C-alpha cells in the first residue's frame, strides 16, 4: 500500500522486530542518556604521524595552501589510516579554523568546496568516531612514501600561486578553474595514484 500511496517515497525506514526485553533494554539506555562506549584516543604513533602530515598541509605559502585544498577536496570522504603493523584507528581529513596544536574547530559545510567563512583554513585529522559501514568505507593509507609523492607532485614543480582562488560557488565548483595553476601532470598523477 505504501508503494502505491507514495510511488517516489523510496524504501521505508524500519527495524526488525525486537522482543519486549530488548525494547526495554534500549529504552532504559536512552533514559540513561544513551551513552556510547569510550573510544580510545589516537595512539602515540598515530599522533606523531598526524603531526607530520598536518605540518605539511598547513604551511603558510600559497603554493602549499592551494595544494592542501586540492588534496582535501579529493580526500574528504576517505577513512585515513597510518601505516603500521596493526592499524587501530581511522581519521577524516577535515577543515578547521584552528591550527595544529589546538583543539579542532570543525568547519561544517555541505560540500568540500563551500565557503569556509574564515580567513585561513587549516587541514586537520580528526579521529573517526562513527560506525564504519562497508558501503561508505574508503580506506586510504598514508605513509612517508605518500608524503614524499605529494611533495614531488605539488610542491617541487616550478609554478607560482599569486592568490588563493575564490570560494564563490560558481568558481569553486569548477575544479578546472579553481586549480588551474597546479600543473596538469601533477593533478593527473595524483588522480592515478
Tell where the protein language model's regions lie, with residue ranges.
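Aromatic- and Gly/Pro-enriched helix-to-coil junctions and flexible linker segments
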Residues: 1-193
Amino acid at each position: 500500500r505504501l508503494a502505491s500511496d507514495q510511488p517516489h517515497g523510496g524504501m521505508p525506514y524500519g527495524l526488525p522486530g525486537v522482543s519486549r526485553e530488548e525494547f526495554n533494554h534500549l529504552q532504559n539506555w536512552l533514559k540513561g542518556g544513551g551513552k556510547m562506549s569510550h573510544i580510545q584516543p589516537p595512539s602515540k604513533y598515530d599522533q606523531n604521524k598526524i603531526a607530520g602530515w598536518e605540518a605539511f598541509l598547513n604551511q603558510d605559502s600559497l603554493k602549499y595552501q592551494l595544494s592542501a585544498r586540492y588534496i582535501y577536496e579529493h580526500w574528504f570522504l576517505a577513512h585515513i589510516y597510518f601505516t603500521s603493523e596493526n592499524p587501530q584507528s581511522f581519521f577524516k581529513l577535515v577543515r578547521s579554523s584552528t591550527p595544529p596544536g589546538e583543539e579542532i574547530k570543525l568547519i561544517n559545510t555541505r560540500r568540500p568546496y563551500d565557503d569556509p567563512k574564515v580567513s585561513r583554513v587549516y587541514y586537520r585529522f580528526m579521529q573517526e568516531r562513527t560506525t564504519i559501514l562497508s558501503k561508505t568505507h574508503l580506506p586510504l593509507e598514508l605513509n612517508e612514501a605518500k608524503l614524499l609523492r605529494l611533495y614531488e607532485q605539488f610542491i617541487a614543480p616550478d609554478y607560482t600561486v599569486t592568490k588563493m582562488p575564490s570560494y564563490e560557488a560558481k568558481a569553486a565548483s569548477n575544479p578546472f578553474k579553481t586549480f588551474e595553476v597546479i600543473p596538469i601532470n601533477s593533478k593527473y598523477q595524483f588522480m592515478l595514484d
